[in-house]
């Protein structure tokens, strides 16, 4: 089924259909978009199932279907609203009845650049929160204070700043700081997933600087935060403390190799300097062994990047 045919069937039954998410953002960035995600509104789930009986339901907390469109299995979600009722990213009550509008769905999303939609079939841009303007200016901006309701959005904003070379709006950085407490209870798999993607960026240091600026480095990567302010002999390290040195090294590694494990090794190569007693600075005798001991105990709490 073509995209045009998919939209035509839905529109014939009073529904609206949109391309949403990263595909829209990347198209505006003039970067080749990848997988398309679709959203439908104005139709009940049962009616959708009747129209597309071969669609495979994969969503649990809210309905998401896999539909073959233009030869690819694409995700199709229903427009929905969310209300925070508990801790973390699972603490939401979701409603997705046909009355939910596209604007309401886009409002629940994290940043303006991710809160745009293209309505089919004409691909008319729906941009109630000025995401296109922020993409043009290279700014990551939260749609609303609801940004804080999923704490890992703070890491995602930092990671996307590194990926796209964007800056983070001041208010959004404050929202990131407001995620500090809940971040401590998040599954480490989610945090490491953002780390892995950040290490794939051209300049991974942007990710860590954004976390530091927002005051959440110490709760997401506490061992790294100990490097801040650790002095080094200026004749060997004119760049400054062990933290500045680490960020320079990880960016240098990124310029030499795309291998995530090698970039991770660069990130933690001086980890033991964070444990150096103040009286010993600016020297860090034995920091190599201390770093190995930290990694052995740390193990990134789940798994180290390997590729």
List the predicted regions and their residue ranges.
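Catalytic cores of the polymerase beta-like nucleotidyltransferase superfamily
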Residues: 1-307
